[in-house]
Amino acid sequence: AGQPVISADGLVGQVVVAYPHAADVLMMTDATHHLPVQVTRTRERAIAVGVGRMDRVELRNLPDTVDIIPGDLLETSGLGERFQPGIPVAQVKEVIRAPGQPFARVIAEPLAPLARLSLVMVDLSEDES
């Protein structure tokens, strides 16, 4: 369990239970999923948080001054050692900077078409079993 699940477009989630010919996968958009990511353009690090929608993850608690813009790509950072660095994750769609608030809220769309997946790969290179 814990292995990354990846499509041709990017990260899907991670294996939580493995069976002989199947697996239960925690999707990266699940409300309980937190994923260390970085902005490919700036290397700014953040945590992508699932919000329970297949088309969205959010970056929270980023300083209002953070250098992040719509169109920026997010990839795994390698922090936490659960996922290798550099796996494509999502594209920033909106950066919300509320006046007087110290933090920006960033909305990103997963690169993998999570609602339409037909084929995925499980990365066994980090399998500890």
What does each of the following model-derived ranges do?
Residues 1-129:
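A secondary-structure micro-motif
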